[in-house]
């Protein structure tokens, strides 16, 4: 019995009509593919089935994908990125049926899938034996997500396989939000980069652990914590130890870092002795930066963060000062990425 007085079987069966809506939303996305994208996703699916790597757009950032069930293909992801082998990958799916083949789904996790998929929510659940240990980073759990772009969904659907995909860049660097950045960084060592334009959100997915009685936020991201709490009508907790945190990618190693130092500060707190610096934020700073990028709000700040970091590292400035946002809504994910980019 769950805390609402219903059995898990009842909760699952009551939600069955909503499954079609997930499929309909995914189908509607895929229907928007251009003829060129159809051709490229067919080619990409062939590469995935053959054990190769394909870079593709999601609504969050560009992903570097491989067959999640092929340990050797997954190994190529780690090698291409220079990614630590104990940093797990997210499994991207195109249907609930595919998800059920990979992980054990409880009724609360199913509710979140029905509410937010396709979308920027990754859910950590007990993994089934079919998922290789290498894909899981050696953990008993796996994170699953249904991405919300036509290209990503079509690539998964046409390959007939779940696709393991971290961000399509060298590990530790700012995540790519356009195809040109992917090509510049790893385009010469992978067979295909599918261009889907700029990503819609610009930050990675929210990762929620649903293995216990209470949901736990492992990584803030494109879906605010408050939205998950509203859907479940319960508090989303924060992780209490490193063992749980490591169930999510992007939480234990330095990530998103530009090639010049990044410091976090308030707009009016730039050191008076600062020279040859760049600014990033929603407000105008004191002093005279070499270059500044001002965003209209935190949503735009989040969407353009990684692109802005790459722009400023090439500006000739010696250091970047960035405004630290309030820790609510998308600001929570933005603060997380800035803190990690600064080495925190």
Residue ranges and their predicted role:
Residues 2-344:
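Active-site-adjacent structural elements in enzyme catalytic cores
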């Amino acid at each position: 019995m769950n805390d609402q007085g219903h059995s898990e079987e009842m909760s699952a069966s009551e939600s069955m009509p909503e499954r079609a809506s997930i499929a309909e939303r995914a189908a509607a996305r895929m229907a928007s593919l251009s003829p060129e994208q159809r051709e490229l996703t067919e080619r990409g699916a062939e590469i995935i089935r053959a054990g190769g790597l394909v870079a593709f757009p999601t609504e969050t950032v560009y992903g570097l994908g491989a067959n999640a069930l092929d340990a050797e293909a997954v190994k190529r992801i780690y090698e291409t990125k220079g990614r630590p082998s104990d940093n797990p990958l997210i499994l991207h799916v195109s249907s609930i049926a595919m998800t059920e083949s990979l992980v054990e789904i409880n009724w609360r996790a199913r509710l979140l899938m029905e509410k937010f998929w396709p979308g920027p929510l990754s859910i950590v659940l007990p993994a089934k034996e079919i998922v290789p240990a290498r894909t899981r980073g050696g953990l008993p759990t796996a994170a699953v997500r249904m991405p919300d772009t036509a290209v990503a969904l079509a690539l998964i659907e046409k390959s007939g396989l779940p696709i393991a995909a971290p961000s399509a860049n060298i590990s530790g660097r700012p995540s790519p939000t356009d195809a040109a950045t992917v090509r510049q960084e790893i385009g010469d060592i992978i067979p295909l980069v599918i261009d889907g334009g700029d990503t819609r959100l610009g930050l990675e997915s929210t990762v929620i652990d649903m293995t216990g009685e209470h949901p736990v936020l492992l990584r803030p991201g494109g879906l605010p914590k408050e939205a998950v709490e509203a859907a479940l009508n319960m508090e989303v907790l924060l992780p209490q130890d490193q063992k749980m945190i490591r169930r999510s990618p992007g939480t234990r190693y330095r990530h998103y870092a530009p090639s010049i130092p990044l410091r976090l500060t308030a707009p009016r707190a730039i050191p008076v002795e600062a020279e040859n610096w760049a600014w990033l934020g929603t407000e105008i700073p004191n002093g005279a930066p070499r270059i500044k990028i001002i965003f209209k709000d935190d949503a735009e700040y989040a969407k353009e963060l990684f692109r802005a970091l790459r722009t400023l590292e090439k500006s000739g400035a010696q250091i970047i000062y960035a405004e630290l946002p309030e820790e609510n809504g998308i600001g929570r994910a933005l603060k997380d990425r800035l803190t990690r980019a600064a080495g925190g």
